[in-house]
Amino acid sequence: MEEGELKDTDHLIDIQLDEVTFVRRRPEVEHERAVAIFDLLEDNHFGIKGFQGPFRLVLSLAENRLLFDIRDGEDKPLRKVILSLRPFRMIVKDYFMICESYFSAIRSMTPAQIEAIDMGRRGLHNEGGAVLKERLAGKVVVDHDTARRLFTLICVLHARG
């Protein structure tokens, strides 16, 4: 299945982060999580060959792996996709560093300086989304924006404190 083959029903109607991986996070990280989930549920393209949407998704981290627990609209398990976290490590690390700069900048820097940092943050989002889309190829089909928002949630799962 390719992105062009997605049907109107091929989308996510619910996204959860596994409670085992849930920790109390900084307000800025919680805001990122809430915005990513809201935006995903408003507009996403998510499909699996051999299954018709809509889908529910539970994301979790376990043993250095990212787990996509994909279910149908009535919460019946359909497929689990497990990805190595190794390809994401540097991007996630860089993303956290630039987010720290961004959160500091919004308190004290000029709008032009904040915009420059935000452009770097968006660039890392694009890179992380592209890596995710590539790693999901052959298993799950997502569009660019869906991949970017899912990458945000991968970063949230990595966030501590």
From Swiss-Prot:
Highest taxon of the lineage: Bacteria
InterPro entries: UCP032146 (IPR008321)
Chain segments annotated as coiled-coil in the UniProt record: none
Record-stated family: Belongs to the UPF0262 family.
Protein name: UPF0262 protein Rru_A2770
